[in-house]
Amino acid sequence: MNDNLNKVEKMIGHTPLVCIEYKYNNIIRYVFAKLEWFNLTGSIKDRSAFEIIKDAYKTGKLKESQPICEVTSGNMGISLCSIAKVTHNPVIICIPKTMSIERIKLLKSFGAKIELLDNFPQCFEKANEYEKQGAYLCKQFENKSNIKAQTKTAKEIAKKLDNVPTFVSGVGTGGTLIGIGRYLKKKYNTKIIAIDPKEAKLLTCGKSQGKHKIQGLSDEIIPKLYDKTIIDEIIEIASDDAICMAKKLCKDLGLNVGISSGANFLGCVLSGEQSCATVFADDNKKYLSTDLTNDEIKSDFIDNIELIKYSIV
């Protein structure tokens, strides 16, 4: 089992870091973004899923053939399914019906047992039932292995950049923002900015105020991993603006990013900072059935952002 995990580890991490040069309000600025779709299954969640499974085996909490269960908006589930194939663990996924059909079909293609439910609270309730029946519940919203995985991402960023003045990221489980943010703040005194879907206002209100379309962010609860003591600012991004920004990154630069990446990039723009680092958590292939391909979605101020070029750092 360990040998198989070691093989998988070689296909996770060490993703490209690009520097995107853009102009906003006639000022040239820069965003340094990790392209996380270069991971095993195409998302940043491969890092967390690997670390969670590895640590669970190491501590004896997970054994071969034992079912793995998780609540997910999609990417973590896909990552778990792939990695669990080499450890010979069946996977049970509890996912809201509102997630993209591509995510659900991908989960089915791995042979996962899927529980489609109305919302995240129902997903957590169902997952707890499976845990009582003997499944290993990953609990990515509170599992410190999630933080550990993204600390490695932070170290990859730090290896490429002499300084990181600002780091911007959305919050789903909190693993990415806190894992990367905490390390960078300690090393560089980096300003940490959290992205909150404008329709939900979860981080500012403590409870979701409405539905949004940025899958992977604001999953109806503030995760236990979220550490507000390291957060310097919260920026709200409207779903349609995030979608338009993701489309623009693809159309103008050829960077085929997912919706949350559009939100992260916009957060960098609206921060007013000269230089920001962020992550592009996945690509656009899981969102082709969503408004990401809807030409009627418009954003007035996105046109004021001129994407000039990108280079590999």
Where are these regions (language model features)?
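PLP-dependent amino-acid enzyme catalytic core
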Residues: 1-313
